[in-house]
Amino acid sequence: MNVISKLAHVDPTAKIGDNVIIEPFVYIEGNVEIGDGCHIRPNAVIRSGARIGANNHIFEGSIIAATPQDFRWNGEESFVIIGDNNTIREHVIINRSSHRDGATRIGSNSFIMAQTHIGHDCHIGNYCVLGTAVKVAGDVSIGNYTILSSNALVHERCDVGDVCLIKGGCRVNSHVPPFTIMAHNPIEYKGINSFVLRKIGKSEATIDEIASAYRHLYHSNTSTYNALRRIEVDVEDSPEKTAIIKFLKDHKLTVAAVPLDLEGD
């Protein structure tokens, strides 16, 4: 049974699942879908285009599917699609896509802390943590099991791979390859995210091979092209090696924290 406060505004066309709690002063527009078991706290705003899965907990003052902060947007219908089992804390803003029928996507089982901003057309993976006051610009992709610590900034159109750790206050201005730790401003490579790799069941041998790959990239004083060739030859084959090589190739060897004079070939 749903518990919907009489002091909340819920558009009659909004689709609300079962066992949903909607507290006073929540504002829910039309063209909204909210899955089973969600809990929406006071003063949250769920705007047109929100597609929210099951068992999400949305705290006070958050705005889901805010209109995109993008001069290209001309009022087209677009969406925010959120998976299941996420916690979205106070005053989080998630903008919908700036493209017709496009979507900003949030996966499942993530924790988005207070005052975080997620721009238009972002894709946030599963099991992510975004710390307090993280700012993610438009068209950013964040991989699974990645942590962005408080006050981290991610520039538009940057991709952050799986199982990364971006430390507090770090400014990400290029693509961050998977399994790495980045810190500071300007951004610096600080090793691999071995703690979370162990948490998700990666073996010590696998972790050592990941570390070996990134020694070629960040500690060999060679170009990213040569580092890629060395990784292909020297590192044992594994899904993680494949993911690293694919990321480097997909981003044309342009990755964060590599000195400009060592980029490319």
Q: Residue locations for each model-derived region?
A:
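Terminal amphipathic alpha-helical/low-complexity segments used for targeting or macromolecular assembly
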Residues: M1-L7, P12-T13, D18-N19, N55, ...
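Structural signal for interior beta-strand "rungs" in well-ordered beta-sheet cores
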Residues: V3-A183, I187-E188
